Structure formats: C-alpha cells, structure tokens
Amino acid sequence: MGKVVVMDHPLIQHKIGIMRRTDTGSKDFRTLVSEVAMLECYEATRDLELTDVEIETPICKATVKELKGKKLAVVPILRAGLGMVEGMLELIPAAKVGHIGMYRDPETAEPIEYYCKLPADCANREVFVVDPMLATGGSAVAALDMLKKRGVKNIHFMCIIAAPEGVKRLTEAHPDVDVYIGALDDHLNEHKYIVPGLGDAGDRIFGTK
C-alpha cells in the first residue's frame, strides 16, 4: 500500500510561498522549482536500501553504507515536469531520465498523450515520476498507467502542489504508489486550476502564456 506524504519542511514551505507570488519571474521560478524538487527528492529516497561496503580511509579500514545497487529513473511529465529534473539529479546523478508527453484537453480537462521515451531497462528501475502540479490527477494516472503497461512496478509520484481531488483520483487508481507533495491546497476551481495554486507551472517555468 502506498503512502501520501505532505512535506512540512520550513524550507519547502518558504520556497513554495515565493513561487505562488505573481511578481516572481521565470528565472527565479525555475530555480525554486529545482530547489523544491531536490528537497522533496531527499524525502522520497528515504527508504532506498543500503548495503555495507568495506573501504579504506586515510586512517584505517572501515565499513560504510552505500546504496544497494538499485537502479533509479526520473520521468518528468512534459512539459512542466522538466523543471524538476535538474533538482532530482543533483541528489541522484546516476539516475536515467525518461519523458512522458501529455497535454490537457481544454474542453474535457483529460490528458492526451503525445510522446513517451523511457530507458530501455525502465521495468527494472525504481521510477520517480515528477510533475509540479497534481490538479485533476488525469495526467498523473495516465502516466502511471503507461509505466505499468511497460512493466514498471516500483513507482513514486512527486509534485510540488496538489489539489485534494487529484490526490484522491491518483491514490484510488494506483493505491500502491507513494505520493510526495510539497503543499496540499484547497480545491480545484471551475477551470480545473488549483486554488490558491500558483498558476500554470509550465508557463511560469518557461516564460510562455
């Protein structure tokens, strides 16, 4: 059974607060997205397995802990998810990166897939799917469906801001997936935007409208 973790770290909350401001420009917004992703990655990798390894320090031989050879992958949901990749790779630089491309139909608010490129051995990796916003949950559910159809079993989902509606939909569709959230907001408005939210994350990351 997966777990839902809402981050309460002061640094995460502070940075998200700055991201929400309308006067935060794209350059600063991009930096904040990357920094929050790195902080969330720290928490999301807490349960990675360790193994004992014998090494030699400048003083003597010693037994130290190292990651137990688990292969990792980061899979952003395009396009906004790209903003979280650099922060993730700061902590797990050996991870492979896949990409899932989706956009939200303006009429139905449901996701439409247009691209999928994953590491060849993705089924054997522990996969972290990243997207700054979890609104309706449609794109997240569809992305996890795609991964599972390709044999991926060990999946985590990470977002910066989520709506309760999206969390409910995601956890009901994929109850085995751990979900990591920077901030859980109030609700979705009539246009399916998160309230209070921070606007369109993709537009704010890339300076588009």
UniProtKB/Swiss-Prot annotation:
Name the Gene3D superfamilies for this protein: 3.40.50.2020
Q: What is this protein called?
A: Uracil phosphoribosyltransferase
Instruction: Report the protein's function.
Output: Catalyzes the conversion of uracil and 5-phospho-alpha-D-ribose 1-diphosphate (PRPP) to UMP and diphosphate.
- InterPro entries hit by this protein: PRibTrfase_dom, PRTase-like, Upp_B, UPRTase/APRTase, Ura_phspho_trans
- Binding positions for uracil? I194, G199, D200, A201
SUPFAM superfamilies documented for this protein: PRTase-like (SSF53271)
Where 5-phospho-alpha-D-ribose 1-diphosphate is bound, by residue?
R79, R104, D131, P132, M133, L134, A135, T136, G137, G138, S139, D200
Q: Which reaction does it catalyse?
A: UMP + diphosphate = 5-phospho-alpha-D-ribose 1-diphosphate + uracil
Q: In which pathway does it act?
A: Pyrimidine metabolism; UMP biosynthesis via salvage pathway; UMP from uracil: step 1/1
User: Which EC numbers does the record give?
Assistant: 2.4.2.9
Q: Which molecular-function annotation in GO is an example for this chain?
A: magnesium ion binding
What PANTHER family does this protein map onto?
ADENINE PHOSPHORIBOSYLTRANSFERASE, URACIL PHOSPHORIBOSYLTRANSFERASE, CHLOROPLASTIC
Enzyme class (EC, first level) = transferase
Cofactor(s) for this UniProt protein: Mg(2+)
Q: How is the cofactor bound?
A: Binds 1 Mg(2+) ion per subunit. The magnesium is bound as Mg-PRPP.
Q: Which residues form a coiled coil?
A: none
Instruction: Please list the disulfide bridges.
Output: none
* One Gene Ontology term from the biological process aspect of the record: UMP salvage
Extent of the signal sequence: none
Activity regulation (record text) = Allosterically activated by GTP.
Q: Which family does the entry's similarity section mention?
A: Belongs to the UPRTase family.
Q: Which HAMAP family match?
A: Upp_B
Q: Write out the entry's keywords from A to Z.
A: Allosteric enzyme, Glycosyltransferase, GTP-binding, Magnesium, Nucleotide-binding, Transferase
